[in-house]
Structures are given as C-alpha cells and as structure tokens.
Swiss-Prot record:
This is Holliday junction branch migration complex subunit RuvA. Keywords: Cytoplasm, DNA damage, DNA recombination, DNA repair, DNA-binding. Pfam families: HHH_5 (PF14520), RuvA_C (PF07499), RuvA_N (PF01330). NCBIfam families: ruvA. Belongs to the RuvA family. It is found in: Cytoplasm. Residues 65-143 are annotated as: Domain II. Homotetramer. Forms an RuvA(8)-RuvB(12)-Holliday junction (HJ) complex. HJ DNA is sandwiched between 2 RuvA tetramers; dsDNA enters through RuvA and exits via RuvB. An RuvB hexamer assembles on each DNA strand where it exits the tetramer. Each RuvB hexamer is contacted by two RuvA subunits (via domain III) on 2 adjacent RuvB subunits; this complex drives branch migration. In the full resolvosome a probable DNA-RuvA(4)-RuvB(12)-RuvC(2) complex forms which resolves the HJ. Gene3D superfamilies: 5' to 3' exonuclease, C-terminal subdomain (1.10.150.20), DNA helicase RuvA subunit, C-terminal domain (1.10.8.10), Nucleic acid-binding proteins (2.40.50.140). It comes from Pseudoalteromonas translucida (strain TAC 125). Signal peptide: none annotated. The RuvA-RuvB-RuvC complex processes Holliday junction (HJ) DNA during genetic recombination and DNA repair, while the RuvA-RuvB complex plays an important role in the rescue of blocked DNA replication forks via replication fork reversal (RFR). RuvA specifically binds to HJ cruciform DNA, conferring on it an open structure. The RuvB hexamer acts as an ATP-dependent pump, pulling dsDNA into and through the RuvAB complex. HJ branch migration allows RuvC to scan DNA until it finds its consensus sequence, where it cleaves and resolves the cruciform DNA. Has three domains with a flexible linker between the domains II and III and assumes an 'L' shape. Domain III is highly mobile and contacts RuvB.
Amino acid sequence: MIGRLNGILVEKQPPEILLEVSGVGYEVQMPMTCFYDLPKVGESAIVYTHFVVREDAQLLFGFNNKVERALFRELLKANGVGPKLGLAILSGMSAQQFVSCVNNEDSTSLVKLPGVGKKTAERLVLEMKDRLKNWGNDLFTPFSDSAVIEPFSDATIANNAADDAVSALVSLGYKLPQAQKAVKSVSKPDMSTEVLIKESLKSML
C-alpha cells in the first residue's frame, strides 16, 4: 500500500495532480479543498494517500494531512459511498465542515453536494455520527478563504481555465449544465482554474 508520497509537483489538472517521486510519476486525485493548498508546479509536495485497487484500475487519492485521509476512509465505510463520491463530498466542503454537518445532523447542507440525495444525506448522518463524535475542531487546520492563488494574466489562458473548471466539476459529479452555469456566474477576468472551481463550489452550496 502507498500511504505517503514526497516529491515534485509536475502537473496540476484539477482534481488530479502528477507527483514525481524518484523519477516515477504518480497520478493522484485530490479533493478540491486539498487542491487549493498545494504548492506551485515545480515545487516539492507531501501527499498522504489512499490506494484503491479495482479490476480495471489502480487509483491513488491524496490529502494534505492524515486527518483528511482518515475522514475519506470513514466515508468509504458508509453504505453506498465509493471513492468517487467521497472525493466529491470532500471537494464540496472541507473535512471540518463535513464533520460539523454530521454532528449537527445537518442533512440539508449535505444534499447540496453532487451525488448526495436526501436519503444518502440522512444515511450519512445516521451511520457516521457515532464514528465522528470525537472529531473536535482541534484536529483541523482551518482553511483560509484568503489563501493566495496565482491568477492568469492572459485572456486565452483564462478561457482555458473556465473550460478546465467545468471539466473538473463534471468529474466531481456535477451535471454539465450545472457546472457551466456555476462557472459562468462567478467567472471574472484573470481567474485561475483553482479560483473558478472554489468560487463555483461555494455558489452551489
């Protein structure tokens, strides 16, 4: 099992990165809430990973710390939650926000996440409340909404950023029209892909 990778960030294509470790490039899928805190391409990064083996693929899911990975693993234990839905849930809200929703029995907020209907939201609260009751705020490093993300300066690149943002949202489970509408509603000149995704996700919650 691959539990941790320490290498150079070669590519960032939300929600996937390519991390080069000792000459080997690892494709790692990450929740967008983790993606925002990644360093720039070309810099070193440490990612805690969860390794999934399927008949048709071997997949790596990455997180910035062990707490986020632990929550992802708890999600996978819930009935009807696979890696793709777990990734979508933790892209739509931070680990701390999800734990708060479960502990407060706030299924209404969970329903706004892609792939989570009313029954799934209620089941998540029911199944996970006991498992997460001891997860206090001291476990989390608060995510800063003011985190600096480099903007694009070229209009053509900005258009590509919008397309990439839509593609990322679709890969997280949102319908194409919904993703396009969200990106269009928040799009401003010189916005990077990460900023577009972040603001689009916020607009849908």
